[in-house]
């Protein structure tokens, strides 16, 4: 896994007053008609049925007695990160992380329950309020000092363009292009850094087009109002999958990092049970099926580990 480098999950921040030197297009105030909008949540959410996944007795035996007797894994998740974990139309938790958790529960003979939480408050509550945290957590040294983490997925930054790539976008070169992205995320910094690099090399700067939501940014690219969409790879992959073939991905996933399921440090038996269940889902093909339903099979890993370095 030497190609996997630490990276943080994109977090929404307050709307910035300025975004560096990149030329700022008036995208935030632009109107998008509902009939044109490529809204992931507005489309039917994938229905993933994990009921056919059978319990594996030798793996279920690894679960600590207290949890096994309770019969349920309690998960803490910040339900604001589609397609990983978000609130569905019925008010319940949905997303590929929620489906993966349910599949892990099937393998271990446990029910699962997800409670909505503030992202920053999940790790401190692991082992007391929550058994696990599966909420698009990037594995990094700082988190590994506090908790154990079981790898199950890889994510990074990726790109999408209008189908056919009419503007000839060749990532990572974005010089002179109109770049659409969701405002208030790590992509704000990416645009500024790329713009500065373009200008330092004597090239054209980036025309920055920030949007309040990723769906509006995707719509701008599909409609030719922007040249390229950038964002976290799970978000971009899901946007492409839901775009009715109006978008396609280009380039490679950059700055790939492992995501991990958070487990308390004093629960090594539970961490090993989770790891073994994830590996079973990898080997059986069930994990790939879940991720494919959400357009994110590119995030597959071959081996699950506890506290990978």
Region roles according to the model:
Residues 8-12:
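N-terminal export leaders
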Residues 27-30:
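C-terminal motif of bacterial Sec signal peptides marking the signal peptidase cleavage site
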Residues 32, 37-57, 106, 165, ...:
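Extended ligand-binding regions for polar small-molecule ligands
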Residues 38-133:
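Extracytoplasmic small-molecule ligand-binding "clamshell" domains
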Residues 93-106, 137-139, 156-213, 228, ...:
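Bilobed "Venus flytrap"/periplasmic-binding protein-like clamshell domains
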Residues 111-173:
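Acidic, polar ligand-binding/catalytic clefts
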Residues 137-144, 192-193, 222-255:
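A ligand-binding cleft/hinge motif common to bilobed small-molecule-binding domains
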Residues 153-161, 237, 241-279, 296-309:
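Periplasmic-binding protein-like
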């Amino acid at each position: 896994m030497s190609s996997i480098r630490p990276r943080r999950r994109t977090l929404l921040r307050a709307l910035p007053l300025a975004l560096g030197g990149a030329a700022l297009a008036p995208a935030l105030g632009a109107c998008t008609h509902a009939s044109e909008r490529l809204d992931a949540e507005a489309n039917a959410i994938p229905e993933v049925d994990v009921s056919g996944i059978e319990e594996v007795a030798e793996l279920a035996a690894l679960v600590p007695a207290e949890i096994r007797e309770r019969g349920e894994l309690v998960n803490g998740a910040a339900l604001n990160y589609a397609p990983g974990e978000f609130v569905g139309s019925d008010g319940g938790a949905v997303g590929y992380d929620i489906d993966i958790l349910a599949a892990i529960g099937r393998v271990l003979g446990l029910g699962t329950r997800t409670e909505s939480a503030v992202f920053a408050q999940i790790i401190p509550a692991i082992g007391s309020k929550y058994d696990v945290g599966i909420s698009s957590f990037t594995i990094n040294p700082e988190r590994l000092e506090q908790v154990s983490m079981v790898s199950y997925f890889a994510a990074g930054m990726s790109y999408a363009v209008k189908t056919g790539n009419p503007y000839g976008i060749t990532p990572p070169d974005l010089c002179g292009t109109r770049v659409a992205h969701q405002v208030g995320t790590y992509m704000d910094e990416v645009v500024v850094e790329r713009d500065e690099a373009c200008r330092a090399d004597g090239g054209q700067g980036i025309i920055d087009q920030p949007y309040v939501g990723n769906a509006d940014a995707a719509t701008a690219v599909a409609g030719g109002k922007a040249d390229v969409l950038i964002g976290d790879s799970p978000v971009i992959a899901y946007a492409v999958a839901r775009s009715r073939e109006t978008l396609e991905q280009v380039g490679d996933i950059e700055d790939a990092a492992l995501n991990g399921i958070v487990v308390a440090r004093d629960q090594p038996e539970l961490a090993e049970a989770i790891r073994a269940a994830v590996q079973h889902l990898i080997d059986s093909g069930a994990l790939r099926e879940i991720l494919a339903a959400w357009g994110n099979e590119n995030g597959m890993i071959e081996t699950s580990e506890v506290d990978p370095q």
